[in-house]
Amino acid sequence: MKTQFIVLIVAIVFLQLLSQSEAIFSAIAGLLSNLLGKRDLRHLDLDQFDDMFDQPEISAADMKFLQDLLR
């Protein structure tokens, strides 16, 4: 009975190791395929950065208002 219990525990441990290592190996494989694969630059959305440059600088009146607000 002890031997069967030990074999069961060892089998459970090995199955856990196998399932966890499969997840790690798939994550590593996905990372390598992203690093070594062809990057698709045709569908790159650069329009998201246009909003950064459309905004005017903060005016002196706005700065004065913010300074008064934070006193």
Curated annotation (Swiss-Prot):
Keywords: Amidation, Antibiotic, Antimicrobial, Cleavage on pair of basic residues, Fungicide, Membrane, Secreted, Signal, Target cell membrane, Target membrane. It is found in: Secreted; Target cell membrane. One of its GO terms (biological process) is killing of cells of another organism. One of its GO terms (cellular component) is other organism cell membrane. The modification Leucine amide is found at residue 36. Antimicrobial peptide. Is active on Mycobacterium abscessus subsp. massiliense (MBC=200 uM), a rapidly growing and emerging pathogen associated with healthcare infections. Also shows antifungal activities. Has a weak hemolytic activity on human erythrocytes (10% at 610 uM), indicating a low toxicity (therapeutic index (TI)=3.05). In addition, treatment of infected macrophages reduces the bacterial load. In vivo, treatment of M.abscessus-infected mice causes a decrease in the bacterial load in the lungs and liver. This is Non-disulfide-bridged peptide 5.5.
